[in-house]
Design a protein with these regions (language model features):
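Bacterial Sec-dependent N-terminal signal peptides
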Residues: 1-30
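N-terminal, active-site-proximal structural segment of metallo-dependent hydrolase catalytic domains
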Residues: 23-117, 121-133, 304-313, 317, ...
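Metal-dependent phosphoester-hydrolase catalytic domains
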Residues: 26-27, 209-222, 230-342
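Catalytic metal-binding/acid-base residues of hydrolase active sites
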Residues: 41, 98-99, 185, 228-231, ...
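Active-site His/acidic residue clusters
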Residues: 51-54, 175, 180-194
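Second-shell loop/turn segments in exported
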Residues: 61-68, 89-95, 122-123, 154-155, ...
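Structured beta-strand-rich core segments of catalytic domains in phosphoester-bond hydrolases
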Residues: 98-185
Length: 342
């Protein structure tokens, strides 16, 4: 083969690769957008909030939480978000275990994320510890039509024993995305712990989806993401994915993730409790914004993992092991969903 032909082929492949990368990059051209969810494991500031139980995250508290540790945590999260975007940070980053708006402002405005024009959606939840669900979004890529925080009609002795669900209508490339961000009650004390409230939240979301589809039939683009403290096999998740009267289907994309993987590791076993559920309207649309199961992944670069000291294999490099500080990122791994446009 002559040198001239090699040059032509190499140049053609280079142009093809560049065009493909452009189509999947977040350069503001509207070709794609990444949505990330991340349980950030207790992102507290170092100041006392007299309205919540945050005493352990004070400089004189049991965790000795101080400015140095807080700054390291902020910079670790910035590093993770930037790496998750590859070409540029995700269009939307949804969080849970955030104490207040101030820590989000420190993350968005106090790091190099300030270059990416992020805006904040946050509201204090009724959680006794004061940890909230919230999100940041890039204003040059996403418009927020509206948002509200939803609470189920919780029954029982403790009506404040849950977090709000953040529901927002987001406009991307001319299409409306209905986005729900969740952090359901923990299974601490066993899998059945908190199940009643988790079922109530699932029922509330199902009612909201019925309301959306009553207006848009089965064409609505819906994304439900978060830390559900339940696996794809649990009944509270199945309640969301059961058949709807409108004929629309909700598909749990997390079920398609490879076996042996997960977002959280408990006693040496990976679990997928941070999940993404989407409507078939997002998967099957013939034009506009869409996604498909292969576009969901668990973000697990080497720096987010460490050797598990008790069990074979790797675990998330967490900030804490019990009450012992180890300076890592989070005890959960983030999940990322890619949205494309056709």
């Amino acid at each position: 083969m002559s040198k001239g032909i090699v040059v032509i082929i190499t140049g053609t492949l280079s142009l093809l690769f560049s065009s493909l990368m452009e189509g999947y990059s977040q350069d503001g051209s509207g070709h794609s957008a990444r949505i990330m969810f991340y349980n950030v494991e207790n992102l507290f500031d170092i100041f006392d909030d007299t309205t919540t139980d945050d005493d352990e995250f004070l400089p004189d508290g049991i965790r000795r939480w101080n400015y140095t540790r807080y700054s390291r945590k902020i910079n670790s999260l910035y590093k993770t978000i930037l790496a998750a975007g590859e070409w540029s940070p995700p269009a939307i980053v949804a969080f849970c275990e955030i104490e207040n708006r101030k820590v989000l402002e420190d993350l968005v405005h106090g790091t190099n994320l300030s270059k990416y024009n992020y805006s904040i959606i946050h509201q204090d939840s009724p959680d006794p510890r004061g940890i909230d669900v919230c999100m940041i979004y890039r204003k040059n890529m996403i418009d927020i039509i509206s948002f509200r925080y939803l609470l189920p009609p919780v029954t029982g002795d403790n009506p404040d024993a849950t977090r709000s669900v953040l529901y927002s209508r987001c406009l991307f490339s001319g299409d409306t995305i209905h986005l729900f961000v969740n952090h359901w009650p923990s299974r601490r004390g066993g899998a059945l712990a908190g199940e009643c409230i988790r079922m109530q939240i699932a029922g509330m979301i199902r009612v909201k989806i019925d309301s959306i589809t009553s207006v848009m039939n089965s064409k609505a683009r819906i994304i439900i993401m978060g830390d559900f403290n339940a696996t794809p096999e649990d009944q509270e998740i199945k309640l969301i994915t059961e058949d709807y009267d409108s004929g629309m289907s909700m598909i749990n994309l997390s079920e398609s993730l490879a076996g042996g993987t997960g977002t959280y590791r408990y006693r040496g076993t990976w679990e997928i409790i941070d999940q993404v559920i989407v409507s078939d309207g997002l998967l099957n649309c013939r034009s506009g914004v869409y996604s498909h199961p292969g576009m969901l992944r668990i973000f697990k670069p080497d720096f987010l993992l460490k050797k598990d000291p008790l069990y074979p294999g790797l675990s998330p490099f967490s900030t804490w092991t019990g009450y012992r500080y180890q300076g890592g990122f989070s005890d959960h791994l983030p999940v990322i969903l890619e949205l494309l446009v056709r």
